[in-house]
Amino acid sequence: MGGTFDPIHHGHLVAASEVAAKFGLDEVVFVPTGQPWQKSHKLVSRPEHRYLMTVIATASNPRFTVSRVDVDRPGPTFTIDTLRDLRAERPDADLFFITGADALAQILSWKDVDELWSLAHFVGVTRPGHELHDMGRDDVSLLEVPAMAISSTDCRTRVGAGNPVWYLVPDGVVQYIAKYGLYAAPANAADLTPALSGSDDQARTE
């Protein structure tokens, strides 16, 4: 499951669990982006913060793991590079790439799209009330997940306004955000990194 995870919230976790159950997945690998292209107009939390919050959030589920392939790779994050790295680590696995359905609609503009189809089955998750458009491909599935009504943007806004995010994000992540003062106003520049400008893919689950 690829995403910025800034912060990871219960919507991400429920979506991962629902997809795992529907498709009989043995493992869900969460892959926090390194330097996301499509957040070019925003500052995002440093990759290490987002990685550690994801580790904390997934620790209690033995089916969930977290990969550093995007965090450790220098330069911008492209889904094709993520999938190539995961394929190299798991050459015999059937890979499913979980992302937001709105992001999936842009897949034809992604880097090396023809190779993407050969590397993984794509699953787009969305919130209730969001219209799902069938892409007409056997290697693309769409799944409605009620908890996806939660968004990372709303969580950041709530923290910045001094409002609680308990029960929107896992307890350990709430404590991590408070410990490092993430999303508080004014933000600590040392905890932020600019996303790279560009027009390519990396529109994943927020």
UniProtKB/Swiss-Prot annotation:
EC number(s) reported in the record: 2.7.7.18
NCBIfam families referenced in this protein's UniProt entry, alphabetically: cyt_tran_rel, nicotinate (nicotinamide) nucleotide adenylyltransferase, PRK00071.1-3
Keywords: ATP-binding, NAD, Nucleotide-binding, Nucleotidyltransferase, Pyridine nucleotide biosynthesis, Transferase
Family, as annotated: Belongs to the NadD family.
Name of the encoding gene: nadD
Keyword DNA damage appears in the UniProt entry: no
One protein family per Pfam: CTP_transf_like
Reaction(s) this enzyme catalyzes, per UniProt: nicotinate beta-D-ribonucleotide + ATP + H(+) = deamido-NAD(+) + diphosphate
Name of this chain's protein: Probable nicotinate-nucleotide adenylyltransferase
Example GO molecular function: ATP binding
InterPro entries: Cyt_trans-like, NadD/NMNAT, Rossmann-like_a/b/a_fold
Protein's UniProt keywords contain Nucleotide-binding: yes
Pathway assignment: Cofactor biosynthesis; NAD(+) biosynthesis; deamido-NAD(+) from nicotinate D-ribonucleotide: step 1/1
Gene3D superfamilies xref list: HUPs (3.40.50.620)
Top-level EC class as recorded in UniProt: transferase
